[in-house]
Swiss-Prot record:
This is Protein Rev. It holds the Pfam family REV. Signal peptide: none annotated. It is found in: Host nucleus, Host nucleolus; Host cytoplasm.
Length: 106
């Protein structure tokens, strides 16, 4: 059921390709305006399809976060190296973050 719904929504988006960049400025502007209006219609239609056929809303469920007082940044000497891992010599982390765990396994 989910795959069928996704295929229908994908077909709707594919049936509205972006406008061609040719013609006068006014013609291009009109084409973009009409394209954006169609995109909005497709977006609302796909939300309706999701809520009707799958019983869920198109909006994501808000993530429950802890209070700001309990959030801390635990930054030690390895700060700033996460973006450069795998570049140059291999680095050994003392404590591998959970987010990067799958990317650091070899």
């Amino acid at each position: 059921e989910l795959l069928k719904t996704v295929r229908v929504i994908k077909f709707l988006y594919q049936s509205n390709p972006p406008p061609r960049p040719e013609g006068t400025r006014q013609a291009r502007r009109n084409r973009r305006r009409r394209w954006r209006a169609r995109q909005r219609q497709i977006q609302s239609l796909s939300g309706w399809i999701l809520s009707t056929f799958l019983g869920r809303s198109a909006e994501p469920v808000p993530l429950q976060l802890p209070p700001l007082e309990r959030l801390t940044l635990d930054c030690n000497e390895d700060c700033g190296t996460s973006g450069t891992q795998g570049v140059g010599s291999p680095q050994i982390l003392v404590e591998s973050p959970t987010v990067l765990e799958s990317g650091t396994k070899e």
